[in-house]
Each structure stands twice: as structure tokens, then as C-alpha cells.
Amino acid sequence: MTPMRITVWRERLQQMRPQRKLLKQTQQRRLLHQLQQRKLL
């Protein structure tokens, strides 16, 4: 691998991390919402 490719790869990784965090947060919220609905029912 050339140094250039490595830097590009690193940048991509850094960009993907926040997206993953957001994904996890939305999933957790959805789960919480479902649980609350079940309790109401």
C-alpha cells in the first residue's frame, strides 16, 4: 500500500465512525420506544 492510500483509508474510517455512532443511537432509541409502547399496552 502506498502512503497516499493509507491516508485516504484513515480519512474514510474517521468519517464512518460518527455515522456508526448515530446508527447505534437511533437503534437504541427505537428499542426504548418499543419497550415504552409495550408497557403502555
Curated annotation (Swiss-Prot):
Function description: Involved in viral RNA replication.
Protein name: Replication-associated protein
Lineage: Viruses, Riboviria, Orthornavirae, Pisuviricota, Pisoniviricetes
